Design a protein with these regions (language model features):
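Metal-dependent polysaccharide deacetylase catalytic core of the NodB/CE4 family, i.e.
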Residues: 32-35, 75-76, 97-231, 263-266
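Electropositive, surface-exposed helix/loop patches at the edges of structured domains
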Residues: 89-102, 140-148, 282-294
Length: 294
């Protein structure tokens, strides 16, 4: 165990012990998300929640509570995973189904075919060096700062030059997961862009065309979505409403406030990989970020 992990565990344990002194959770819902968690991190987090009698909410149950502004008392949690990482099939799904835990997987459509997210190409330094004369903006700008139309032009070139081992689930795997009573597949755009960098045409493609394609794949409605990287603005919220999403999620690090939160700006607290048990739990509960803001 590294010094960093050890110190994080000590701080996390102290934060968890301090939390026991009392916390008003009435009308609050813990909203957490993972990407590609290792089995240990995911299982430790869920076991912690189970031991403390959290009620695990499906996304439909969450929508019903928030849309009706129902009174909520006691511990409630909503769990989601972003991007449909293939590692979820071995590290998450078996545990979820054994323990009957409802989860939502926010799934971008294009990576189901490509096998990886677009950033895989843009973070390949050897590949970028080969293309830097033709696309000098790759050397000057962070990929996420590129307009989506510019990104797409470069991406089409990079995709012809190199392929990678699959990291994201296949269409068939997503279809099979959607048959589980504990797993809901929902929208995460077409290509996982920075939505605030999209023009109106790209926005329609990312939010509406992706929704139609995912619905066709699943044979069922797609009613909810998560903003890639948590980026959104009022124009994107309006587009989600226009394309008949009922609810959308950000990456704002806090609990859901049932009486007041906007259905299209719901927070989620990230549980990243690479940390020890107690730091992971403190991050899941939002205690770590609260400490950093002090």
């Amino acid at each position: 165990m590294s010094i960093r992990v050890l110190m994080g565990n000590i701080i996390g344990l102290l934060l968890l012990q301090g939390r026991m002194s009392g916390l008003n959770i009435d009308n609050k819902i813990l909203s957490i998300y993972f990407h590609n968690p290792c089995r240990r991190v995911f299982e430790e987090c869920i076991k912690y929640l189970k031991d403390r009698k959290y009620k695990f909410l499906s996304i439909d149950e969450l929508y019903s509570i928030i849309s009706k502004r129902e009174q909520v008392s006691g511990n409630h949690v909503f769990i989601s995973l972003d991007d449909a990482w293939r590692g979820n099939l071995s590290n998450v799904i078996p545990f979820v189904e054994r323990n009957k835990i409802p989860i939502t997987i926010f799934t971008p459509v294009q990576p189901l075919n490509d096998g990886v997210l677009w950033l895989k190409w843009f973070r390949d330094e050897e590949l970028i060096d080969k293309c830097s004369d033709e696309y000098p903006e790759l050397k000057r700008r962070v990929p996420k700062s590129l307009l989506t139309a510019v990104r797409n032009n470069i991406w089409n070139k990079l995709r012809d030059l190199k392929s990678y081992p699959r990291e994201i689930m296949t269409e068939a795997e997503i279809q099979k997961l959607s048959e589980s009573p504990f797993i809901t597949i929902e929208g995460h755009t077409m290509t996982h862009p920075i939505l605030t960098k999209c023009d109106e045409w790209d926005l329609e493609y990312e939010l509406n065309v992706s929704k139609e394609k995912l619905e066709a794949l699943l044979g069922s409605p797609v009613s909810y979505m998560a903003y890639p990287n948590g980026d959104y603005n009022d124009n994107i919220v309006e587009a989600c409403q226009r394309y008949n999403y009922k609810m959308a999620f950000t990456t704002e690090q806090r609990m859901i406030d049932v009486p007041s939160d906007n259905l299209y700006k719901l927070p989620r607290q990230c549980v990243p990989n690479g940390y020890g048990k107690y730091e992971s739990l403190a991050r899941m509960l939002g205690l770590w970020n609260k400490m950093l803001r002090v």
